[in-house]
Amino acid sequence: MMATDTSLTTSQTFAANRAVGEVAVEVRADGGVTRRGPVHEAGSLRVRFPSPEQQGLSAVLVNTAGGVAGGDRFSISLDVQAHARLTLTTAAAEKVYRTHGPAAQLDIKLKVASGGHLAWLPQETILFDQARAERRIDIELADDASLLLSEMVIFGRSAMGETMQHGRFVDRWRMRRGGKLVFAETVRLDGDIASLFGRPAVLNGGVAIGTALIVPGDAALVERLREAADTFGAEVGISAWNGFAMARFCAQNAARLRADMMTILGRAAGRALPRLWLS
């Protein structure tokens, strides 16, 4: 009988089962109407445009893989050209599953040209226990571009009473405005991360965090947002510097975080949130 070489079976099988997805979207202004430019889709990522082209265009990002697993690689690029307007959300919360392999890689690039506006409003990212994910968010804005961005991360399936005990989450944000770096931050949680959650400087006992970023933003906007904060169930800090405003949340559960985030975004946007947020 001929011998079979199985030395690479495990690694080859793991690599073959990993999902890869890419989406690149360009939108352009044409006579006051925002229209789709080139759209590129590959692998398990898709983008859909549920509303007709009008003053602002809405888009929905869909992950047909049903979630994110170790070793997956996803790339999203949005290019909002001069005076165009785009709002993008996701079809559902993104789940990052447990893995004993390498971390999933998520690469997000957001570019907004002069007079353009982007609302990047994905639903929650839920990290299962022993999930491993590394995310990069790179933002490039013209001096007079505007941005409304939200990100929410849930550590464990809180609705099922599960808290993330071990895993890895690296979140790297960089924002440039007019070619100048105006915001840079990297969050790094690795290993026994549950032991960090109780620390006041980390999560202070919470299991859900959120960030809302508003450009441009000033002291007047901060005061308007703080007027709503007295009713929040989550801890929140709101401030402005370098021409933008930011609200940071830490909550005991995902539902509380989502409700408070919706209030902040509604005030910042001055218009209704995507319908998928309300379902």
Swiss-Prot record:
Keywords (A to Z) from UniProt: Chaperone, Cytoplasm, Nickel insertion
A family per Pfam: UreD
Record localization: Cytoplasm
Cellular component GO terms held in the UniProt record: cytoplasm
Domain of life: Bacteria
GO molecular function, one term: nickel cation binding
InterPro entries: UreD
HAMAP family: UreD
Family, similarity comment: Belongs to the UreD family.
Functional summary from the UniProt entry: Required for maturation of urease via the functional incorporation of the urease nickel metallocenter.
Complex formation: UreD, UreF and UreG form a complex that acts as a GTP-hydrolysis-dependent molecular chaperone, activating the urease apoprotein by helping to assemble the nickel containing metallocenter of UreC. The UreE protein probably delivers the nickel.
Record protein name field: Urease accessory protein UreD
Organism: Rhodopseudomonas palustris (strain ATCC BAA-98 / CGA009)
Encoding gene (name): ureD
